[in-house]
């Protein structure tokens, strides 16, 4: 496992973004872990978060023209990712985000920032039902752009109502790569080597066995 993945897990734990225990999800499932990226909510947190996204983007050698952060959670993520890519790698990439309701005055429209054109790198926190990605795809298509890849913080690798995960459904429906800073297997690998949290490994393995995807 790459160093940036280990560091991200430790960072998420230190901010209570990632917690182990017993959590009731919206789906009704009881999960042995919970991830809430909204708790990355200070300048220092967001700066580091952007660096982890940038590391994942560079590690996967993604080709793209513009970064798109869909409203609402994707807006600060897209912003901090663009700054991190410049500060760490010297890449000055344009960034764009949408507003939920179009304005009919001022700059108008529902997009802010760079024009949404060419190959688009979409950044968000997680994909649960895939609804936000589908809404973003409508916006990308309406502007004549192409979705190049999606990068999220965590891939739960968990089945939805069918046999596929939400991430797999997005990859199938839009023929694009969905990458993540970390995924469920990374959490398991971390638990296997960390004495402080290793007690959660059995419940995590059991959850993956019941709900996980390949």
Swiss-Prot record:
Organism taxonomic ancestry: Bacteria, Pseudomonadati, Pseudomonadota, Gammaproteobacteria, Pasteurellales
Protein name, UniProt field: Orotate phosphoribosyltransferase
One annotated GO molecular function: orotate phosphoribosyltransferase activity
InterPro entries: OPRT, Or_phspho_trans_dom, PRibTrfase_dom, PRTase-like
Gene name of the record: pyrE
Family assignment from sequence similarity: Belongs to the purine/pyrimidine phosphoribosyltransferase family. PyrE subfamily.
Subunit annotation: Homodimer.
Reported cofactor(s): Mg(2+)
GO terms of biological process kind: 'de novo' pyrimidine nucleobase biosynthetic process; 'de novo' UMP biosynthetic process; pyrimidine ribonucleoside biosynthetic process
Record organism: Actinobacillus succinogenes (strain ATCC 55618 / DSM 22257 / CCUG 43843 / 130Z)
């Amino acid at each position: 496992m790459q160093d940036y993945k280990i560091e991200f897990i430790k960072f998420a734990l230190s901010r209570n973004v990632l917690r182990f225990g017993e959590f009731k999800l919206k789906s009704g499932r009881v999960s042995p872990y919970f991830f809430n990226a909204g708790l990355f909510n200070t300048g220092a947190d967001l700066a580091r978060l952007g660096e982890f996204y940038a590391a994942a983007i560079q590690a996967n050698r993604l080709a793209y023209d513009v970064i798109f952060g869909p409203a609402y959670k994707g807006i600060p993520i897209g912003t901090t990712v663009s700054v991190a890519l410049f500060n760490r790698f010297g890449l000055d990439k344009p960034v764009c985000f949408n507003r939920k309701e179009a304005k009919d005055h001022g700059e108008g429209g529902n997009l802010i920032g760079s024009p949404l054109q060419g190959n688009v790198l979409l950044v968000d926190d997680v994909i649960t039902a895939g609804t936000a990605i589908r809404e973003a795809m409508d916006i990308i298509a309406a502007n004549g752009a192409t979705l190049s890849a999606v990068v999220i913080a965590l891939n739960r690798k968990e089945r939805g109502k069918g046999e596929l995960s939400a991430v797999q459904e997005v990859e199938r429906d839009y023929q694009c790569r969905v990458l993540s800073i970390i995924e469920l297997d990374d959490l398991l690998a971390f638990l296997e080597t960390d004495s402080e949290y290793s007690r959660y490994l059995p419940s995590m393995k059991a959850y993956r066995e019941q709900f996980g995807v390949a």
